[in-house]
């Protein structure tokens, strides 16, 4: 607990046998667990206990996994450092003076510290991959629709996916095997994962694989990060892969488009937290608007408030076309860029994060710095593509991750390539 990786420690025993029998799993605290607090890292939901399990939780338990706790996170998933949590920041187990990444920082820290064998996070703009990179573990964001979101407390519905965090690529793939597949409770899910065997794909055989390297996702990155990334590419070439330069000009606008869309969706999704149906009460003194305002001012932290306000502004009548519409057009451009690129390459590679893990407290006073750290991860969410972060050594004693992005439902390809980086 010295890392503050868990908000709630508990034991939820799974089935007597199954592929996860004897395996401990930590679950991010925005994934519903019946009768166990699911706070989303917020004062607003500090006492909330869901009346049902998320589909992925049911999958875990049916596979024999044992849930050992609900992990700390940036409030409602809004952050890149796990410092915006109402329950305090999580520390990076590699260096406790630094952030673990976010928003699934508690999940990554728990796995890296050995407090859980595996973990679940959610990834809206990099929230599984960023903490995996910063904590030196593996994090995988599945294709949108591969894993059920039923029971995930929504931040930005069109962007987010639940994904595994593990010490190894094979471990992440094994957990993906358990949670992937269609769900009658989530109309966005597809059949693609029903018969897949992701763990068997982690062979590391990249002979003949073509890897695209976009300059747009290395420009401006820390030199130490780029050095480790280039070394990983050299290792892949030595194993028979080919690397080629590709262009993704749309990625220059990805962060801006992502934040407009995510904040806009958040302003709608979080409207339900008004102190009446959910959340802390506003006291019901005065009129309803005052009551709602009091409840939300008391229940939400600064970053969540900022994003709700910006999202509401972007959707407002006078600015919808200027911001939200243009962001959606940029999103379509990102998707088109990737589609054209995957006509020529099998995977796209970049550093997961452009910088090394910041010191605790460094980003809180400069939210723009925090937003820009998502430059390499947000494009995969905008394009609804699978992406994995795998450790690629360290720089000055701090972990560096390599990100591999694949075409839709190309999880097996990126898992195979990630296994080669890992070796």
Swiss-Prot record:
Catalysis: reaction(s): L-glutamyl-tRNA(Gln) + L-glutamine + ATP + H2O = L-glutaminyl-tRNA(Gln) + L-glutamate + ADP + phosphate + H(+)
GO biological process: translation
InterPro entries recorded: Amidase, Amidase_CS, Amidase_dom, AS_sf, GatA
Pfam family, one: Amidase
Keywords: ATP-binding, Ligase, Nucleotide-binding, Protein biosynthesis
Known EC number: 6.3.5.7
Residues forming the catalytic site: 28, 103, 127
MF terms (GO), sorted A to Z: ATP binding; glutaminyl-tRNA synthase (glutamine-hydrolyzing) activity
GO CC terms, sorted: glutamyl-tRNA(Gln) amidotransferase complex
Role played: Allows the formation of correctly charged Gln-tRNA(Gln) through the transamidation of misacylated Glu-tRNA(Gln) in organisms which lack glutaminyl-tRNA synthetase. The reaction takes place in the presence of glutamine and ATP through an activated gamma-phospho-Glu-tRNA(Gln).
HAMAP family: GatA
Assembly mode: Heterotrimer of A, B and C subunits.
Similarity-based family: Belongs to the amidase family. GatA subfamily.
Protein's UniProt name: Glutamyl-tRNA(Gln) amidotransferase subunit A
């Amino acid at each position: 607990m010295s890392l503050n990786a868990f908000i709630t420690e508990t034991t939820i025993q799974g089935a007597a046998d199954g592929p996860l029998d004897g395996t401990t799993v930590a679950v991010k605290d925005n994934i519903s667990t019946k009768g166990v607090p699911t706070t989303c890292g917020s004062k607003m939901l500090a006492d909330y206990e869901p009346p049902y399990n998320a589909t992925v939780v049911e999958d875990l338990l049916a596979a024999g996994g044992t849930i050992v706790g609900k992990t700390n996170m940036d409030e409602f998933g809004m952050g890149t450092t796990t410092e915006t949590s109402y329950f305090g920041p999580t520390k990076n187990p590699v260096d406790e003076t630094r952030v673990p990444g976010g928003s699934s920082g508690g999940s990554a820290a728990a796995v890296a510290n050995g407090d859980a064998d595996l973990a679940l996070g959610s990834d809206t703009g990099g929230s599984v991959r960023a903490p995996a990179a910063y904590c030196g573990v593996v994090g995988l964001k599945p294709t949108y629709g591969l894993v059920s979101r039923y029971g995930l407390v929504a931040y930005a519905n069109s962007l987010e996916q639940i994904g595994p965090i593990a010490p190894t690529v094979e471990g992440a793939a094994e957990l993906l095997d358990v949670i992937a597949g269609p769900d009658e409770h989530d109309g966005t899910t597809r059949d693609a994962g029903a018969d897949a065997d992701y763990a068997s794909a982690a062979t590391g055989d990249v002979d003949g694989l073509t890897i695209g390297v976009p300059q747009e996702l290395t420009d401006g990155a820390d030199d130490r990060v780029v050095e480790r990334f280039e070394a990983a590419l050299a290792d892949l070439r030595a194993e028979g892969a080919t690397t080629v330069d590709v262009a993704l000009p749309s990625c220059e606008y990805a962060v801006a488009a992502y934040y407009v869309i995510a904040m806009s969706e958040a302003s709608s999704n979080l409207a339900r937290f008004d102190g009446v149906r959910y959340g802390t009460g506003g006291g019901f003194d005065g009129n309803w608007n005052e009551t709602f305002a009091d409840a939300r001012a008391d229940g939400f932290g600064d970053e969540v408030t900022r994003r709700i306000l910006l999202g509401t502004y972007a959707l407002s009548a006078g600015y919808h076309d200027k911001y939200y519409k243009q962001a959606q057009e940029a999103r379509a451009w990102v998707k088109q860029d990737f589609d054209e690129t995957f006509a020529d390459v099998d995977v796209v590679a970049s550093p997961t994060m452009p910088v090394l893990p910041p010191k605790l407290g460094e980003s809180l006073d400069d939210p723009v710095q925090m937003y820009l750290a998502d430059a390499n991860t947000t494009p995969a969410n905008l394009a609804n593509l699978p992406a994995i972060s795998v450790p690629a050594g360290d720089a000055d004693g701090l972990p560096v991750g390599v990100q591999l992005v694949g075409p839709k439902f190309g999880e097996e390809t990126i898992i195979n390539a990630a296994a080669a980086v890992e070796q």
